[in-house]
Amino acid sequence: MELIQNAFEQGLIPGIVIVIYLIINKIIDNNKRNPLDDIAKLLNIVTRDIIEKDREKSKSVVFIAINNAASECTKFVASTIITNNVDSNRDQIEYNARHLVNSVYYDTYSKLNMYRGDEDYLSHYMKEEWKEDIYGDIINIVYNKNLDSNQRILAFNKRIDIRVNDYTAYIINKAFK
């Protein structure tokens, strides 16, 4: 009996010390923030920032790509009006205009296909009918007999600027809701 009492006394004090240590350790751990939570918060902030920058970059790409296409069309119209006898070269001008419009449309399409909106690639918001609209503008303005050369060039510049703004706004609004 004395042996059991002696063992109990010797084991009780270390047991109490261990229990107190575990309680204090648990209290300290609860007061500490979990480092994984801090890492998760940091990743959320960084990811959100990257996504927002990517959205802004994509919006800029839409504007630049469509503006470049419009610039090519404007150069074509200006050089055609200035250097060609438009009446005698009508077939060639129409052929060149058709191919230019197709070329700049698909070039813009391929550039926009490298970037995504919220749900889909930016190029998927382009419309095939835009090619016909631009082609029609080129032909109608180049062959407008009521305007002189400078007026036709200015008229096309104004028309293409309106289209650039419309197409850019359309793609951005559809891609980034």
Question: Which positions does each model-derived feature cover?
Answer:
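N-terminal signal-anchor transmembrane alpha helix of single-pass membrane proteins
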Residues: 3-32
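Short juxtamembrane segments adjacent to a transmembrane helix
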Residues: 28-60, 64
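Charged, low-complexity interaction regions
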Residues: 51-62, 82-91, 115-121, 143-154
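Repeat-associated, polar segments at repeat-unit boundaries in modular proteins
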Residues: 73, 96-105, 109
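Acidic, low-complexity, intrinsically disordered interaction modules
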Residues: 95, 99, 114-136, 140, ...
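Amphipathic alpha-helical binding modules
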Residues: 133-135, 139-176
